[in-house]
């Protein structure tokens, strides 16, 4: 069980290819991100990202991930004028081919982030994550996934489903790379991934989400005392094991509801509740809305 992949899957982020283009200087794009985040992959040349006024130099093979809600820019040089990314097709079509001007090729992917309460792990992500190609081994999955994305796009018949899966894989490795090279001394999820007992407990809860867990059963599964596992959860994650389980079940239930293939009764049993009523009561306690009202809000009804 991979806890990070489970968290990302349950988050319900949906990828959308914004741009895949090659441009000659000068150029610049603005990326509005009120309800989205995303990343940029630089396949050729160099450019700059600008986030909250800070310039970030990007070179071939670099990946820049930007968190939800951060409007930002991508420019060839710091003084280039910018246009909204929605107009990138107009700009690319107007450019004339040149053998002299530097050429930059990049892929931009947007992730639409649901308005629902997200997993607390996402609150610990920085404004942006920069993955420098020079910091990644040649055969690292980050590089392999970039190649597969480029090949899928170059084929001209790229499947939306395949691109969605590949971008999800890339997002996973970008975040895992950040976790590996930026350890934290403060309490939080970044430490949970490195605490063997916490990780074992999380894996048990995720693997058997419908099991009638108690603190006693969880402590036996992990091989520590009830007091020890309870204290570790509070110190590292800021909640009790049972509070975490309740939120985990609701997140899973929310994901199943969005699929529209299950009745509320089926969802309740899948995530460990005896009835749709019990599930609905717990759901409203955590989200402040009943499952039905939550779905109506999601669909804009």
What residue spans do the PLM features occupy?
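An amphipathic alpha-helical interaction segment
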Residues: 107-116, 124-189, 193-203, 228
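Residue at a beta-strand N-cap/secondary-structure junction
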Residues: 48, 55, 212, 261-262
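A general structural signal marking secondary-structure boundaries and capping sites
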Residues: 68, 78, 113, 152-156, ...
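Regular secondary-structure segments
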Residues: 43, 145-153, 202, 206-209, ...
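Generic protein-terminus/edge-of-domain signal
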Residues: 1-65, 70-97
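Amphipathic alpha-helical recognition patches that constitute DNA-binding helices
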Residues: 38, 59, 158-166, 188, ...
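A hydrophobic/aromatic-rich effector-binding and dimerization subdomain
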Residues: 3-10, 71-150, 180
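Basic/polar phosphate-binding segments, predominantly the helix-turn-helix DNA-binding elements
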Residues: 169, 173-179, 200, 204-251, ...
């Amino acid at each position: 069980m991979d806890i990070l992949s489970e968290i990302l899957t349950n988050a319900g982020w949906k990828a959308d290819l914004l741009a895949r283009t090659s441009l000659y200087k000068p150029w610049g794009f603005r990326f509005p991100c009120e309800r989205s985040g995303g990343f940029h992959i630089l396949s050729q040349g160099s450019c700059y990202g600008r986030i909250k006024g800070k310039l970030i130099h990007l070179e071939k093979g670099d990946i820049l991930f930007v968190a939800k809600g951060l409007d930002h820019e991508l420019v060839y040089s710091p003084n280039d004028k910018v246009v909204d990314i929605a107009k990138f097709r107009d700009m690319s079509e107007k450019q004339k081919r040149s053998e002299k001007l530097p050429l930059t090729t990049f892929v931009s992917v947007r992730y639409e982030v649901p308005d629902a309460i997200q997993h607390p792990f996402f609150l610990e992500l920085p404004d942006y994550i920069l993955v420098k190609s020079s910091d990644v081994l040649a055969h690292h999955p980050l590089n392999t996934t970039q190649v597969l994305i480029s090949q899928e796009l170059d084929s001209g018949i790229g499947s939306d489903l395949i691109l969605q899966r590949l971008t999800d894989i890339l997002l996973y490795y970008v975040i895992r790379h950040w976790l590996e090279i930026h350890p934290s001394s403060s309490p939080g999820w970044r430490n949970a991934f490195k605490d063997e007992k916490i990780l074992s407990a999380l894996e048990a809860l995720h693997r058997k989400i419908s099991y009638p867990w108690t603190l006693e059963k969880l402590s036996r599964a992990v091989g520590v005392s009830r007091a020890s596992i309870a204290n570790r959860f509070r110190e590292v994650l800021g909640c009790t094991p049972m509070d975490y389980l309740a939120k985990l079940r609701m997140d899973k239930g929310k994901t199943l509801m969005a699929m529209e293939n299950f009745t509320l009764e089926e969802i309740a049993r899948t995530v460990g509740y005896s009835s749709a009523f019990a599930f609905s009561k717990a759901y409203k306690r955590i989200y402040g809305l009943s499952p039905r009202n939550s779905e109506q809000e999601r669909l804009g009804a």
